[in-house]
């Protein structure tokens, strides 16, 4: 599959002792081939328990291309969790704990009773998803599924802190030697 091959060929860089992989799906660099984006979108759809939900929720920035394509494919509205505050009624501030620090995100456009699917590019520590899932719970949304493309870590944390099992297309390990795909799903 293209996703696995492209991950195994992805360059890695060291930032303060942490090995990051650079990939079109997770970084937008280098260019994102349409056939890779299509493959990922179809695999995400296969991962869903049902397509009977109200909205797709994704996180700025690297969840947007995934969410937009899925929104078009499944004819569902797209909600983008943003990194900037708009001050709209009902806006929810989310604390996003990442491997390299803490940031704020802002959720708009989700109401009590909305059935949502959360889509993101990668999970490393689980901090972003824990914050987002808690915010969705706070507004009374029903989380139908949470799917990420690449799982690097954080799956147990999300399950323990929210009770939600995150689905993923591939699980990877990253070191100075590169990216190793250790599990592949929804092919």
Swiss-Prot record:
GO terms for cellular component: cytoplasm. It catalyses: IMP + diphosphate = hypoxanthine + 5-phospho-alpha-D-ribose 1-diphosphate; GMP + diphosphate = guanine + 5-phospho-alpha-D-ribose 1-diphosphate. Its EC number is 2.4.2.8. Keywords: Cytoplasm, Glycosyltransferase, Purine salvage, Transferase. InterPro entries: HGPRTase-like, PRibTrfase_dom, PRTase-like, Pur/Pyrimidine_PRTase. GO terms for molecular function: guanine phosphoribosyltransferase activity; hypoxanthine phosphoribosyltransferase activity. GO terms for biological process: IMP salvage; purine ribonucleoside salvage. Coiled coil: none annotated. SUPFAM superfamilies: PRTase-like. Pfam families: Pribosyltran. It is found in: Cytoplasm. Pathway: Purine metabolism; IMP biosynthesis via salvage pathway; IMP from hypoxanthine: step 1/1. PANTHER family: HYPOXANTHINE/GUANINE PHOSPHORIBOSYLTRANSFERASE (PTHR43864), XANTHINE PHOSPHORIBOSYLTRANSFERASE (PTHR43864:SF1). Belongs to the purine/pyrimidine phosphoribosyltransferase family. Archaeal HPRT subfamily. Catalyzes a salvage reaction resulting in the formation of IMP that is energically less costly than de novo synthesis. Homodimer. This is Hypoxanthine/guanine phosphoribosyltransferase. It comes from Methanopyrus kandleri (strain AV19 / DSM 6324 / JCM 9639 / NBRC 100938). The lineage of its organism: Archaea, Methanobacteriati, Methanobacteriota, Methanomada group, Methanopyri. The gene is hpt.
């Amino acid at each position: 599959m293209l996703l696995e091959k492209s991950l195994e060929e992805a360059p890695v860089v060291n930032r303060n002792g942490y090995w990051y992989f650079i990939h079109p799906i997770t970084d937008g660099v280098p260019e994102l081939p349409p056939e890779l984006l299509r493959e990922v979108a179809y695999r995400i759809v296969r991962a869903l328990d049902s397509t009977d939900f109200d909205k797709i929720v994704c996180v700025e920035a690297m969840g947007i291309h995934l969410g937009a394509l899925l929104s078009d494919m499944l004819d569902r509205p797209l909600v983008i969790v943003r990194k900037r505050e708009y001050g709209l009624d009902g806006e929810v501030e989310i604390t996003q704990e990442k491997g390299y620090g803490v940031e704020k995100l802002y959720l708009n456009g989700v109401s009590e009773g909305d059935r949502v699917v959360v889509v993101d590019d990668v999970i490393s520590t689980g901090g972003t998803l824990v914050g987002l899932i808690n915010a969705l719970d706070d507004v009374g949304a029903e989380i139908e599924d949470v799917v990420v493309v690449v799982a690097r870590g954080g799956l147990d944390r999300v399950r323990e802190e929210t009770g939600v099992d995150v689905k993923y297309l591939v699980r990877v390990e990253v070191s100075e030697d590169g990216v190793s795909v250790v599990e592949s799903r929804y092919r």
